[in-house]
Amino acid sequence: MEKISAAITAIGGYVPDDVLSNAMLEKMVETNDEWIYTRTGIRERRILKDPSKGTSFLAIEAAKDLLNKKGLDPKEIDLLILASATPDMPVALTGPYVASQIGATNAFAFDLQAACSSFLFGVSVAAKYIESGRYKKVLLVGADKMSSIIDYTDRATCILFGDGAGAALFEPNYEGLGVKDEILKSDGIGRNHLYIKAGGSLCPTTAQTVAEKQHFVFQDGKTVFKYAVTGMADVAEEVLKRNNLTNNDVQWLTPHQANKRIIDATAERMGLPAEKVMLNIHKYGNTTSATIILALNDYEQQLKKGDNIVLAAFGGGFTWGAIYLKWAYDGAQVKK
């Protein structure tokens, strides 16, 4: 029997219309455009302002974009995985709701949470289902409404995050294209440095936790930056060595868009010039589970069949990793 690889055969994306620029943040907290941009690489981010819409709305729009571009009947989807750090509710999975709303009536669905590494870990999980031979079409959606868990009086976090979603369809491939290798890691020390304190079983919601703003993201920025710079760069470099790839063999690095300095450090360790690095953090900020797939979506027209691509991410937990894949189609042939 031929070896089955899991290849991405279609992608889609969605960001809300409302823009939150650095200039607008200057009026909200003590900061300025130059300070934000030089430290993060971010100029603006998108915000889903409608309080009646959650992460599921973003996910549904991204999935619909993929279905329209691919011309795919949603009933053909076998499994939908929603990668997200901001589900609609703590209980009642968001993935099954997204599946029902897009008409994927034959799919089962579940949520996956690994903070900013959610989509990367989701690629690994989606690939395993395809490689099993039992599933033909797996839809992975990375989506987050980060604005719902951000304190817009906290300069340390409100400048970083935005809302958005992206989707990727995985199908079997017999040409050696698709996911080739992965290095995924985690370290529980991370829970001390990047977290939402309240709202879980350890610290249930009370009037006091709400009053003390314990339901917003807290980040020890310096510590997280230190771990992220080394973690992402280490695994990206390791996945190249393990597959006997040089920097000349790699067409694209698709990094998690958390901070341009982290991205630059990872590219430098891999020996990659800026023109081989996908970058859209200036437009969207850190969309958490959506960054990698939104970058692929933005660069889709430039992707060629057979391109060697390295995906890399670092997130809370801590969680981090790198995935090496061979791209399965010519993006220039896709109708936007």
Predicted regions and their residues:
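Flexible, glycine-rich active-site loops centered on histidine and acidic residues
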Residues: 131-165
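Short glycine-rich phosphate-binding loop at a beta-alpha junction
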Residues: 75-83, 247-256
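Claisen-condensing/thiolase-fold acyl-transfer catalytic domains that form or cleave C-C bonds
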Residues: 56, 60-63, 67, 86-87, ...
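Glycine/charged-rich beta-loop-alpha catalytic/anionic-binding loops adjacent to active sites
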Residues: 42-46, 76-81, 100-113, 148-153, ...
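Acidic-glycine-rich active-site phosphate/pyrophosphate-binding loop
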Residues: 29-38, 89-103, 139-146, 201-209, ...
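Short beta-strand segments
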Residues: 9, 83, 113, 138-144, ...
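Anion-binding (especially nucleotide phosphate/pyrophosphate-binding) glycine-rich loop
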Residues: 69-105
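Condensing-enzyme catalytic core mediating Claisen C-C bond formation in acyl metabolism
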Residues: 1-50, 154-226, 230, 234, ...
